[in-house]
Amino acid sequence: MTNKNAYAQSGVDVEAGYEVVERIKKHVARTERAGVMGALGGFGGMFDLSKTGVKEPVLISGTDGVGTKLMLAIKYDKHDTIGQDCVAMCVNDIIAAGAEPLYFLDYVATGKNEPAKLEQVVAGVAEGCVQAGAALIGGETAEMPGMYGEDDYDLAGFAVGVAEKSQIIDGSKVVEGDVLLGLASSGIHSNGYSLVRRVFADYTGEEVLPELEGKKLKEVLLEPTRIYVKAVLPLIKEELVNGIAHITGGGFIENVPRMFADDLAAEIDESKVPVLPIFKALEKYGQIKHEEMFEIFNMGVGLMLAVSPENVERVKELLDEAVYEIGRIVKKENESVIIK
């Protein structure tokens, strides 16, 4: 018995791994950008920081996954957008610190290497990288029989970006009186899916619920996370933004306070929040308390900006999309987030 056959008998298909690498090359090529050095397949991805033109570069990194949204991708056998979710979760975090994404690495672990399926996953990662302007410079695909079921896989990623030292957004510039602007989310994004799956556990995904405006449930649940990089970078370059909050797990309550000092609070006018239909459906069918929704989900606002009043109109002009004035920064009395 050869080593190759012995390995195959243990459940690891080396040839399938080679096939995955060949399949994903064209997707990786889409993400090429200035600064990338070397080719796919090296022991480490390389990037020439001098190509960014940043005078005082500070590297900012972020890592994340997509949680149990993966279980719905597997359930509905749709794998071509979950990679975008993974990229979004990472790059939206680092843009909140003022960083332009430079490159991305992904990690996929699976019980059985299915090249066609994994190509779809990486194609989604590549699409996310294109939207973020980041190069996909490396990754790992691990076949782990016994750790995962044959149809199961997990996905995580790691993003690195750069900011001018003087343009880092760390909350120190947010002051009382700043206006809170909300940028629309595309849907649930990638948080709260353990609850989402419980609410819709008995649904096939083919249902067209009256709240969902003609869309199938599975389409809404797997809507990829919006990537905010290209919308927000021009604002950072012009130093128009004092604070940024990426609304992820923990909703408004946990994430908004992360962009300002402990002596401040966010006062939010609930009537100005563009609540998406899926959140109304979740609240109704899951019998979730209304106030708890803001502790779990983005409620239609995926990114929140704190902006000086005199810069609001310029920010709206540059964004060229629907921008929601949903509140303001006030002095903290008790709670860090007040929703009225």
Curated annotation (Swiss-Prot):
**EC class (word):** ligase
Q: List the disulfide bonds.
A: none
Q: Which domain of life is it from?
A: Bacteria
InterPro entries per the UniProt record, alphabetical: PurM-like_C_dom, PurM-like_C_sf, PurM-like_N, PurM-like_N_sf, PurM_cligase
Q: Which keywords does this chain's UniProt record carry?
A: ATP-binding, Cytoplasm, Ligase, Nucleotide-binding, Purine biosynthesis
Q: Does the keyword Transcription regulation apply?
A: no
Q: Which GO biological process annotations does it have?
A: 'de novo' IMP biosynthetic process; adenine biosynthetic process
Q: Does the keyword Signal apply?
A: no
The terms describing its cellular component in GO are: cytosol
Q: Which reaction does it catalyse?
A: 2-formamido-N(1)-(5-O-phospho-beta-D-ribosyl)acetamidine + ATP = 5-amino-1-(5-phospho-beta-D-ribosyl)imidazole + ADP + phosphate + H(+)
E.C. number: 6.3.3.1
What Pfam families does the database record attribute to this sequence? AIRS, AIRS_C
According to its UniProt record, where is this protein located? Cytoplasm
Q: Name one GO molecular function term.
A: phosphoribosylamine-glycine ligase activity
Q: In which pathway does it act?
A: Purine metabolism; IMP biosynthesis via de novo pathway; 5-amino-1-(5-phospho-D-ribosyl)imidazole from N(2)-formyl-N(1)-(5-phospho-D-ribosyl)glycinamide: step 2/2
Q: Which CDD domains match?
A: PurM
What the entry lists under Gene3D superfamilies is as follows: PurM-like C-terminal domain (3.90.650.10), PurM-like, N-terminal domain (3.30.1330.10)
The record, for NCBIfam families, names: purM
Family statement: Belongs to the AIR synthase family.
Q: What is this protein called?
A: Phosphoribosylformylglycinamidine cyclo-ligase
> What is the organism field in this record?
Streptococcus pneumoniae (strain Hungary19A-6)
Gene transcribed to yield this protein: purM
